[in-house]
């Protein structure tokens, strides 16, 4: 009789095991983070670096970081090397300065260094495997940690994240200092998106435009091909399906904004018009609880980020400088400073777990899983 009673429970038990494994691998993977606290330093460093990679795109999941690293390797091994070197430089600088161990192990001091390194490689006109570039990559990565450490106490007063202010600042200073004719670190000049096309393109290719929406997510990591962009989108989905939708939604909105401003088709097709909108939309998804009000706010912020990016790109492009992610950074900060009571009640304090992560959605959908 006992055997007969236990038999019907097996499918339910397998389902619970599957959901438990899914919960362990998605969201912030807090159980793994707790488990790694007493492990050897190299293991903690690996986890912290993978989290730092995912922090670039507002995630906090080491598996997502591993997928993004695979995407970078697929896009360009040289770019992946530069990114990891910048990440390590900024992380070790934080350790040397004695920054909070929990913040270091969560990757909060790594992602700005990685972004600086990636964009130094993108704008370098010396080609791949130009080893002299490793020097500014290390120095730039370390500089982002100094800026992060300095800005954090100021921004904490308003419950604001440091975000990528250090990355944008260091990259801009580097490109202004080196210029396009530097004998050691020459760079490509950035082109304004509103500049005339080299040839007369009047017909819009819809398939390429739709592909550009996908590439807008990949361009957050300077990936301009479909395969790596898909891997990055999967990494976002692993952490939060809602954020993956927001990333595509923001990129699509930003692409439409680019069309309305007659942006060069090459910017639309390559995703360069979409990544600021994707980030702007995702910021709301990370720092606000999902509701119809915050959904409208995410759309509005994506539009604001897109038009701000076009304006800054046209302004800085005259000087041969990129606007990088200044637009999403500035508009995202303004959105987090909103004081209206109908939105303020949905605001998630900085540093709190993300309620749109995969694990949270599964738990709220199945209250019995709290017992697992």
PLM segments and residue spans:
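N-terminal signal-anchor module of multipass membrane proteins
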Residues: 1-99, 215-222, 231-239, 332, ...
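C-terminal ends of transmembrane helices
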Residues: 90-102, 145-155, 232-237, 283-286
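Aromatic-anchored segments of alpha-helical transmembrane domains
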Residues: 91-92, 144-145, 170-176, 252-260, ...
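A structural feature that tracks compact, well-ordered secondary-structure segments
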Residues: 94-109, 114-125, 258-289
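Membrane-interface helix-loop-helix junctions at boundaries between adjacent transmembrane segments
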Residues: 106-109, 113-193
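Loop-to-transmembrane alpha-helix initiation sites
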Residues: 132-135, 158-166, 270-275, 295-299, ...
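Generic multipass alpha-helical transmembrane bundles of integral membrane proteins
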Residues: 163-238, 242-252
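Central hydrophobic cores of alpha-helical transmembrane segments
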Residues: 166-170, 247-254, 295-306, 328
